[in-house]
Every structure is written in structure tokens, then in C-alpha cells.
Amino acid sequence: IKGSFYNTQWKDRNLTKSVTTGQGDSGDTDIIYLTGVNQSHTGVEIESKVALHEMVDVDFIVSLGDWYFNGDANGDYTEMEYNDDNQIIGQTSTEYQYALNGLMVGDMPQTSYVGGLTLKPIDGLRVQGLYKWYDNHFSDWSPDSREVDGDADRAQVWKTPSYGKLDLHLSYKLPEIAGLDMTISAHMFNALDNVYVQDAVDNSQYNGYGDKVHAAHNAEVFLGTPRHFNLGLSVNF
């Protein structure tokens, strides 16, 4: 059994905002570099392997994560004021705030379980089944979508449904032929042909309209690949 614990604190991750003013050193558009985009990534990972018999192995992997934004972000933009003669007569400062505190990091499952059974009934033959389960997968989203304009939007992004899939693998090492080591293999991915959401974008530019709530009907989703096969032959010399 192997295990690990991690606690990673990301401080001031890069986030910029474009501001169009009609003035500014860069013409019509300036860039604000925001501060306070912090993330906390904490989790545990456990991996175990048990040989029940010389022909039977059992594997189990657990990954439990808790990844979220820690604190809000903000940035100030100072715009020069000009008179009709294009002379500076003052300046105006605008503060931009982003409601990020407590929101979950998206685009990857934070919880996963993997169970595997490997059979080796005869010399050179290996048959394996792997069942993978994914949970706590929050949609991908950008911190700049949480700019405060009136009431702060602090609702969590849409979380995709949990899902599992079964992969099957078979390999057989052929007897040596003319000094060549050859192995044939066959793989069946998503053997149960499950339909699942593999990735999602919260309030996407294509689906996020109308009520703008963080729900499935406003998300852009990408389904996982249906059942598919792979055959292979490897040669070592």
C-alpha cells in the first residue's frame, strides 16, 4: 500500500482584464493585472496491490481532492482625464472585483476510484479489467466570469453527473520467433458503452443565455467516447 497527502497553495495566479477607454498608452485598450487569485489544492491518494494468487492480482486506487479558490480578486485601473487640448487635467480610478472565494476549481474530477482485477491463467497471457469511477467534476469556468456588477454571483458552477466506465485489456506474449519477442494485445474501452459527460463548460458562449444560472441547460457538454476497440502487435528485437 502506498499513500500520499498534498497541500498546495497557489498565490496570485495570472488573471488579466482588458479595459477599453479610448485613451491610454496602448491606444484603445489597456490591460489590468489582477491580484488575489489564490487556489488551495488539498487531497490524499492511496494505491494498493494485492496478489491473491500467483495468477490473480487485485488493484485499488483512491484519489480524494478538495480544490477551491481562496479569497476574492481585485484590480485597480487609473484612467487619465484630458481636456480639449489633450492635456492631462486629472485622473479617475476604477476598482474591479471578482467574487471567487469558496468556488470550486473546475475542469477535472476531484474524486476518483479505480478497481482492477488481473488474471494470468497461463504463461504469457494477461487479462485485466479496470473499473473507473469519477465524481466531484465541476464544469470548466473562468474567474473573469465572476466580475462583480451589483450583487456578487457566488453560486457554484454546474457539477457534472458522476460516472463510471469499464475498460478490458488482453495481452499474450508469443513464443520467440527468429529471435523476435512479439506480443499481441486487444483493448476494449468503455466496454459497457456508458453515456457520460466527460467535460463541460459552465455558462458557455453557445448555451449560456436566458436565466444565466449555473445549471445543465446553460452548460456546453462533451460526451465521453462510446465503446471502442484497439488491436496491437509489438515486436522487440
Explain the meaning of each model-derived region.
Residues 4, 154-160, 171, 219:
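Short, glycine/charged-rich beta-strand-loop motifs at protein surfaces that mediate ligand recognition
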Residues 6-11, 32-143, 234:
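Gram-negative outer-membrane beta-barrel transporters
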Residues 53, 57-59, 63, 160-168, ...:
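Conserved long hydrophobic alpha-helices within structured protein cores
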Residues 124, 133-144, 172-237:
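C-terminal beta-signal and adjacent terminal beta-strands/loops
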